[in-house]
Regions:
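Charged docking surfaces used in two-component/phosphorelay signaling
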Residues: 13-24
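The feature encodes the CheY-like receiver
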Residues: 15, 57, 75, 87, ...
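C-terminal output helix
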Residues: 107-117
């Protein structure tokens, strides 16, 4: 089964570039253009990884990340922030919000895909679990 990646980005050209490269590498790709849609789609498709822009309409990426981390269904999905915000403060804020990794724009599509492949290949400790406590 192909791994599912949710791309949360409001720039249509960048969404197309990222989606094309991920699909070419064998991933299934879903997209969202704002924070509210990102939350809905993350909860409905339960992706294996989320690529999350920070500067989004509605809820920003920091808020989206924090909400996803508080939701048991999405708390363990790796989240990679992909943003033009390159300051140390933004990186720290992103990691404190629960990001797994932080990639700044502009980026190499090959580097982005390689990072996604690495993260989705990691053990299930970062992945959502559906086991019930007995």
């Amino acid at each position: 089964m192909r791994k599912k990646i949710l791309v949360v980005e409001d720039d249509p050209e960048l969404v197309e570039l990222i989606s094309f490269n991920l699909r070419a590498s064998g991933f299934a790709v879903g997209t969202a253009a704002d924070g509210i849609d990102a939350l809905k789609k993350a909860r409905s498709i339960l992706p294996d990884l989320i690529l999350l822009d920070l500067m989004l309409p509605g809820l920003d990426g920091f808020a989206v990340c924090e909400i996803l981390r508080r939701d048991a269904a999405t708390a363990r999905i790796p989240i990679v922030m992909v943003t033009a915000m390159s300051s140390q403060f933004a990186r720290l804020t992103g990691m404190e919000a629960g990001a797994t990794d932080y990639i700044t724009k502009p980026f190499s599509p090959k580097h982005l895909v390689a990072r996604v492949q690495e993260l989705v290949a990691q053990p299930a400790t970062l992945q959502p679990t559906s086991s019930a406590i007995s």
